[in-house]
Amino acid sequence: MDGIKYAVFTDKSIRLLGKNQYTSNVESGSTRTEIKHWVELFFGVKVIAMNSHRLPGKSRRMGPIMGHTMHYRRMIITLQPGYSIPPLRKKRT
């Protein structure tokens, strides 16, 4: 589970769940083929498409020093109809 950091739950990602598309943040150095192979192997699903984009880091100030957070990559994984990925984290009660 080195490639995928965590699942993303935003308004857009929740809307994409209806189209059988799952969104997650992955390691910046990971390639599409690595992530596709890992998802198919770990979850036992068939991936038909993957879209990715790199999100920029944000500026952070600590007193007089200006810094920034690291950039990261987000993948939108489309599965074949009939397949699904269970939630990666259960809801707290």
Swiss-Prot record:
PANTHER family: 60S RIBOSOMAL PROTEIN L23A. Part of the 50S ribosomal subunit. Keywords: Chloroplast, Plastid, Ribonucleoprotein, Ribosomal protein, RNA-binding, rRNA-binding. GO terms for biological process: translation. Pfam families: Ribosomal_L23. It comes from the Eukaryota. Binds to 23S rRNA. It is found in: Plastid, Chloroplast. Belongs to the universal ribosomal protein uL23 family. One of its GO terms (molecular function) is mRNA binding. One of its GO terms (cellular component) is ribosome. This is Large ribosomal subunit protein uL23cz/uL23cy. The lineage of its organism: Eukaryota, Viridiplantae, Streptophyta, Embryophyta, Tracheophyta. The gene is rpl23-A.
